[in-house]
């Protein structure tokens, strides 16, 4: 079909291995909200063929995604029930954050008690340069969080508009978030 492609990320060391995060949108409407129609896909042949690697993970709608260039090459993906999930919804966005250390074969939640699921939706997502397996995540409530590989959440910044993207430089420890938009 014509998938709702959000992001494509190459594996840092395996030539031809790609990961894609997708949603339910289609050129001809909206796909049925079932497993296989949204989530994460992996290609091992430069994108010629794709395998669904998001089986059993909910919510399925996946958008922000990043992969750590350091071993074990953690792939982190944020997901929500729909493209329109928001902190303004009754019950909040119901967003989740997942990580795989084996190219999407297995996934584990990076959410703590407060974020399982999260009332805020996750839009900005990048690798934390200060911690292998850690990420920085931006929310639709104007917050940026540092999330460790052990799923410990630390508030880095707040009081901003919705954080749609994050750039963290190599020397980010002294000034954790270099650019937030």
Identify the meaning behind each predicted range:
Residues 1-181:
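Extracellular glycan-interacting surfaces
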């Amino acid at each position: 079909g014509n998938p709702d492609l959000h992001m494509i990320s190459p594996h840092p060391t395996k030539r031809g291995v790609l990961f894609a995060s997708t949603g339910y949108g289609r050129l001809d409407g909206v796909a049925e909200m079932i497993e296989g129609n949204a989530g994460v896909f992996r290609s091992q042949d430069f994108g010629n063929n794709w395998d669904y690697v998001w089986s059993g993970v909910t919510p399925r709608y996946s958008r922000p995604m990043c992969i750590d260039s350091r071993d074990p090459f953690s792939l982190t993906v944020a997901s929500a029930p729909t493209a329109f999930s928001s902190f303004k919804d009754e019950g909040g966005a119901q967003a989740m954050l997942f990580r795989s250390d084996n190219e999407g074969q297995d996934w584990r939640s990076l959410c703590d008690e407060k974020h399982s699921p999260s009332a805020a939706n996750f839009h900005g997502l990048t690798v934390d340069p200060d911690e292998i397996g850690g990420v920085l995540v931006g929310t639709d409530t104007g917050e940026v969080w540092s999330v460790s590989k052990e799923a410990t959440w630390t508030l880095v910044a707040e009081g901003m508009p919705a954080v749609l993207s994050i750039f963290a430089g190599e020397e980010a420890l002294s000034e954790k978030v270099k650019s937030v938009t």
